[in-house]
Amino acid sequence: MTRVKRGNVARKRRNKILKLAKGFRGSHSRLFRTANQQVMKALRNAYRDRRKRKRDFRRLWIARINAASRLHGLSYSQLIGNLKKANVQLNRKMLAQLAVLDPVAFDQVVTVAAQTRR
């Protein structure tokens, strides 16, 4: 059987993993096997949480819009439904920003939605 010399390749592969594990505590940043496990777990969690972040922000925006719209006597679903009927093209992120940072502008948006209801 022929001899396979892969010292550089193996070392580079291990160093790549150890570089990714920089900042981990204890053996998780020093020993290849534990570092490899932790890097794989970290990458898996990062992949999952990039998707989860989108869901979490949407929930936050909806909660903020709902709270602000109920101050004006409309529920969230009524507000969104009436805005769609009125052809107002504001997404949930922009509505939540208006509700928090510019309540006067949000009042005007709610007024448009309330007039559409009638």
UniProtKB/Swiss-Prot annotation:
What protein name is recorded for this chain? Large ribosomal subunit protein bL20
State the GO CC annotations.
ribonucleoprotein complex; ribosome
Give the HAMAP family listed for this entry: Ribosomal_bL20
Known function = Binds directly to 23S ribosomal RNA and is necessary for the in vitro assembly process of the 50S ribosomal subunit. It is not involved in the protein synthesizing functions of that subunit.
Q: Which family does it belong to?
A: Belongs to the bacterial ribosomal protein bL20 family.
Database matches in InterPro entries = Ribosomal_bL20, RIBOSOMAL_L20_CS, Ribosomal_protein_bL20_C
- Is Ribosomal protein tagged as a keyword? yes
NCBIfam families noted in UniProt: rplT_bact
Q: What domain of life does the UniProt record list for this protein's source? A: Bacteria
GO-annotated molecular function:
rRNA binding; structural constituent of ribosome
Q: Tell me the keywords, alphabetical order.
A: Ribonucleoprotein, Ribosomal protein, RNA-binding, rRNA-binding
- GO biological process terms on file: ribosomal large subunit assembly; translation
